Structures are given as structure tokens and as C-alpha cells.
Amino acid sequence: MYSAVNPDCRIIHGASPVTLLKAIRNEQEIAGIHAAMQRDGVALVKFLKWLEASVPTGKETEISIDKKLHEFRAEQDLYMGESFDTIAGYKEHGAIVHYEATPETDVQLKPEGFLLLDSGAQYLDGTTDITRTIALGKLTEEEKTDYTLILKGHIALAMAVFPAGTRGAQLDVLARMPIWQRRMNFLHGTGHGVGHFLNVHEGPQSIRCLLYTSPSPRD
């Protein structure tokens, strides 16, 4: 595309004016998002009911549940496909950022521990991106504690009241504070914008730490 630009044209390097326009939802987009989320929620409820009954059989794996979730979503009206490759990580795999199960890494699910499920769909009236941490059975005390700390961060962020102009990096602290107090952290973002039948990650809005390299005071 760049090479097709007429050399007589003046090229301006900067943010596209379309970016900010897309960041503000009109009434039709908001209604579409609500409708898409409702249908996606129906698919997820059906999937979770199926998962609860299927895991104890010992026949399900990370890959097989990914396929089943796709089937439930495909039943919904206006479904066009997945918005990104599903991340279904069982136990240790759930700690790998953007993990994708392969025939070599695929593991059997058991009625114990956590399953991390990060998935979404494209519908004609909206895009979804849903992450859930699902207890498949008995949990360790460490797992219970970690889950509770993350829940506290979610609640703090969801309940936040802030003035216009507040940055996502400032709000990000609210979500991380409970785990920071335990000397823990996560190195990925906390939240991001979602497109309207477009990119599942869509800026410029984002809730994440400002990660950069700076000299240490002791250097």
C-alpha cells in the first residue's frame, strides 16, 4: 500500500484521525455490543455446563474443549468466527502468556486445579473477548489465595471513580495493588479496547503499566 502512494503526495507521519473516532461508540454500536455479549454469554453458559459434566470422564483435553466451545458459539445468530485463537491453558499452562495448545503440549483435563480460558468471537453486531479462570475441582491453598487477590484487584478497578483525563496506567495500579502487596506481579496488560466487528485489540485506550527502561538510582 505504501509503495502505491503517489510520490507527489505529502506523507504525514502520526496517529490516524480514525483511531479516536473509533474509540467513541455510538448508540447503534453500543446496542450491538450488548446483543453480541448476550449471545456469547449463552454459548459460554452452555459450554460451562458441558465442561462440568465432561471433565470427570477423563476424555477432554485443552484442544478438545477449544473445539467444543467453537461449536457452541457457532450456534449463535450472526456468528462469523473466532476473534482470536483460543487460549485454553490447564494448570501451569495457564501461566504462559498467549499459550496455544498444540498436539505436543496438549494435556488431559482433570477434576482439580484451574483452567484458564481466554476466547472470543466475531459477530456481525459486535466483537467479544472473554477471559475466565475456571476451577475444575479441588484447589490448593495457594491457588485459592491467588484467585482471591486477583478478584480483589478486579473489584477495585471496576468500582473506580475517576476524573476525565485519567490514564490507563494510573488505573492499572488498582488492579495490581493486592498482588503487589504480596510481592507478586504479572507482566502483561490488564485491559484493552475491543473493536466493533473489527480488531479484538483496539486502541488507543488501554489499562496497563507503562513499561520502559530507565537507569537505576544506584547506577
Named regions from a protein language model:
Residues 1-214, 218-219:
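Active-site neighborhoods and metal-handling regions in enzymes and metal-associated proteins
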